[in-house]
Amino acid sequence: MVADWNAALARARAHAPFLALALQRRPELAALLAEGLDEAALAAARAEGAGIEDTGLALRRERLSLALVLAVGDLAGAFPLARVMAELTGFADRALDAAMRAVVQRRCPDAPFAGFSAIALGKQGAGER
């Protein structure tokens, strides 16, 4: 199946208010998707929060961009469910790691981050095989 990016973008704008707003906020991602550059759009979405010191803001920006690219990719028929779930799992893992690092840094600014363990279900567990 060949991905129909323009039709997917049109459907997203017409029928999904969240995606329509995300497309307005991230026109560079919309342009990449319109050109069928799905891997470049995914890479840009993953990097959206890089360099932002505020962890919450960085995670919100990445989440918005990743949700946009994955949803339009799904509508276009470009991303199988396993790929979407793997990307969501990867983001959940990065978000949990960043949040824990920020909390430890805030509570113990002079202590090195020694890591943590988590038992997770839901999006975290989607990577199971």
Task: Cite the ranges covered by each PLM segment.
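Non-catalytic regulatory/linker segments of enzymes
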Residues: 1-129
